């Protein structure tokens, strides 16, 4: 699947400190120590609706990681999937009277436009689940052969994963069983399905039903479950020893827990990823942003209104990536004003020395992507430049390059 074009990333003199990120499994901030090539897998969209600000905030967080790794001199192997075969997609296509494949193609195209407008660096591999069916089938076969999966008896011989197949299951989320069961039911699971060995067992392969797409397999025609898609794509594109698995905090359980468990079953490793990183949720004017409330703020909608995507990006980066936070007109207005001040300061013929502020920006971003502190440091430099001027002719360009390279904001 085609991704999108990335804008060039400036090279900033100097070197960033070691990157440290909060790991959901360990419940602490600790160093990320990739080799020459840093690897990251981030869960992509289910393409049945347009990109909203919650999506955007998540992908901006991992874009920062991508940029900081580049600043450290790493090659980056970044993989993102598209869940282009799933119930919400089929339901929306049926509601709108369109082919599900056409709907998916339309929404993926819009997502690409939104990501390019927000200057999110494109993934190395952008893979639809429908493009990875062979790898998914191979992984399900391995799980069946090892006893980690079983075929359900009955009219629909679906394949399920045994939630007790690994001793470490549950380490990523740290949730107790009751919490798991509640979230499993809320987020696409089927704890009440008759015939399963355990209520928490997760669907690997849904046997063919009338009116649904299906693919042939050794265990019968059908289509992939949700979690196995990401496990198969990550293992086939990156392999074991992933540096970062990421997504929104609503994916911690069941999606990321099961994705990791599926992969760990076949690799024998205790951890699918060295770091599990999750971004907070975005609300609107004090309320949770959701389709049911009808209060989604769409990136494409803001662009259509003439809002500068750089201001959208800067507004989302004003909050810490792990925090649940709210978008509002005030947030946007502050971002627009900040963008104007930064542009005015970085187009001066000279300004205050920039070495110290560049070092602080790197330091703050390396400390679990502390964008509020990094932005505050840049605000301070811009205020000094506009109020008092300076004699360093290189400083304005250096600050502009730093903002571009590390924060992804083009002034």
Swiss-Prot record:
GO CC annotation, single: cytosol
Keywords carried by this UniProt record: ATP-binding, Ligase, Metal-binding, Nucleotide-binding, Zinc
GO molecular function term, any single one: zinc ion binding
Motif 'ERGGDP' region, residue numbers: 186-191
Top-level enzyme category: ligase
Gene3D superfamilies from the UniProt entry: Anticodon-binding domain of a subclass of class I aminoacyl-tRNA synthetases, HUPs
Residue numbers binding L-cysteinyl-5'-AMP: 43-46, 58, 81-83, 226, 248-250, 282
Family to which the UniProt record says this protein belongs: Belongs to the class-I aminoacyl-tRNA synthetase family. MshC subfamily.
HAMAP family per UniProt: MshC (MF_01697)
UniProt cross-references to NCBIfam families, sorted A to Z: mycothiol_MshC
Protein name according to UniProt: L-cysteine:1D-myo-inositol 2-amino-2-deoxy-alpha-D-glucopyranoside ligase
């Amino acid at each position: 699947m085609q991704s999108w074009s990335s804008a060039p990333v400036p090279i900033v003199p100097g070197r960033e400190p070691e990157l440290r990120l909060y790991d959901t499994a360990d419940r602490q901030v600790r160093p990320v120590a990739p080799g020459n090539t840093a690897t990251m897998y981030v869960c992509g969209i289910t393409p049945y609706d347009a990109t909203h600000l919650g999506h955007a905030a998540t992908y901006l967080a991992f874009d920062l990681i991508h940029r900081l790794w580049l600043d450290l001199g790493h090659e980056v192997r970044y993989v993102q999937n598209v869940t282009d075969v799933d119930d919400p997609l089929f339901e929306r296509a049926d509601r709108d009277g369109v082919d599900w494949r056409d709907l998916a193609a339309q929404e993926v195209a819009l997502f690409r436009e939104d990501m390019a407008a927000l200057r999110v660096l494109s993934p190395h591999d952008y893979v639809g689940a429908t493009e990875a069916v062979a790898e998914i089938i191979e992984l399900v076969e391995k799980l069946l052969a090892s006893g980690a999966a079983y075929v359900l008896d009955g009219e629909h011989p679906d394949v399920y994963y045994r939630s007790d197949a690994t001793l470490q299951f549950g380490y990523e989320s740290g949730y107790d069983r009751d919490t798991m069961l509640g979230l499993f039911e809320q987020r696409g699971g089927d704890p009440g399905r008759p015939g399963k060995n355990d209520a928490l067992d997760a669907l690997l392969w849904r046997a063919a039903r009338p009116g649904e797409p299906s693919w042939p397999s050794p265990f019968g025609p059908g289509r992939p479950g949700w979690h196995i898609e990401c496990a198969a794509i990550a293992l086939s594109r990156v392999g074991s020893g992933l540096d970062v698995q990421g997504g929104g905090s609503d994916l911690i359980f069941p999606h990321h827990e099961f994705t990791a468990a599926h992969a760990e079953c076949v690799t024998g490793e205790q951890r699918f990823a060295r770091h599990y990183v999750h971004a907070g949720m975005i609300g609107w004017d004090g309320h949770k942003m959701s389709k049911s409330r009808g209060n989604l703020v769409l990136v494409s909608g803001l662009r259509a209104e003439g809002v500068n995507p750089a201001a959208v990006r800067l507004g989302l980066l004003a909050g810490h990536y792990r925090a649940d936070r709210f978008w509002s007109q005030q947030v946007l207005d502050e971002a627009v004003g900040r963008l104007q001040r930064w542009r005015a300061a970085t187009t001066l013929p000279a300004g205050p020395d920039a070495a110290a502020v560049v070092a602080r920006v790197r330091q703050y971003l390396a400390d679990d992507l502390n964008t509020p502190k990094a932005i505050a440091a840049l605000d301070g430099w811009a205020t000094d430049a506009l109020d008092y001027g300076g004699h360093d002719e290189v400083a304005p360009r250096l600050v502009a390059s730093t903002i571009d390279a590390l924060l992804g904001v083009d002034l």
